[in-house]
Amino acid sequence: MLLDDQLKYWVLLPISIVMVLTGVLKQYIMTLITGSSANEAQPRVKLTEWQYLQWAQLLIGNGGNLSSDAFAAKKEFLVKDLTEERHLAKAKQQDGSQAGEVPNPFNDPSMSNAMMNMAKGNMASFIPQTIIMWWVNHFFAGFILMQLPFPLTAKFKEMLQTGIICQDLDVRWVSSISWYFISVLGLNPVYNLIGLNDQDMGIQAGIGGPQGPQGPPQSQVDKAMHAMANDLTIIQHETCLDNVEQRVLKQYM
């Protein structure tokens, strides 16, 4: 079967360009409606807590790339810092409860902002996708756009040939509405290429923007710090830099 060359200019390219431009426009809209609240979702003390826990995890996982002296210095600093809870947020909540207690999520402003941003993100994702799906179904229904260059099993026929009623058609042929779904699920690398982050786009989850790193619950942060300090204390350090000069000379001489 041969396809008209004009299909890629009048069907394939318009759908692809509209999908990319819609994603870019949605990013700017989400920045306008959730930009200020998203940046205030995590207070600085919470970010500091999370960053020190992440630092300890990275040291445990990648300590073999450091020399013994460097690892020992970082280990001593982190163990002392985590044990003494220097960066633990101990401020009281607005309702008077201690930070170590489990907070009421309905009284947490950051939780309310996160839920509102999620609702805005869902709307900003659902409405454009619904409009574009109607546009593709109305103007490009029944078109076969391309043939994939690799073989597929018959189970992909229903996914790739939506709107095409032809049992004998090879499974590799792709319809217009199927190309729309493929674009929705596979445009994240394109957004990364043009400078839009996956988390900022929120294509799959429908969220409005970055909410900051999510660490352990407030009631468990102190326990997590002590557990991480204990792990750092008992870890056996094996560096890949021991006798590296002799190993390099032995390999190349």
UniProtKB/Swiss-Prot annotation:
Superkingdom of origin organism: Eukaryota
Predominant subcellular localization, coarse grouping: endoplasmic reticulum
Segments traversing the membrane: 10-30, 126-146, 176-196
Gene Ontology MF terms: protein-folding chaperone binding
Topological category with respect to the lipid bilayer: Multi-pass membrane protein
GO BP terms in the entry: phospholipid metabolic process; phospholipid transport; protein folding in endoplasmic reticulum; protein insertion into ER membrane by stop-transfer membrane-anchor sequence
Subcellular location: Endoplasmic reticulum membrane
InterPro entries: EMC3, EMC3/TMCO1
GO cellular component, one term: EMC complex
Record keywords, A-Z: Endoplasmic reticulum, Membrane, Transmembrane, Transmembrane helix
Statement: the UniProt record of this protein carries the keyword tRNA processing: no
Family: Belongs to the EMC3 family.
Binding partners and assembly: Component of the ER membrane protein complex (EMC), which is composed of EMC1, EMC2, EMC3, EMC4, EMC5 and EMC6.
Name used for this protein in its record: ER membrane protein complex subunit 3
Source species: Saccharomyces cerevisiae (strain ATCC 204508 / S288c) (Baker's yeast)
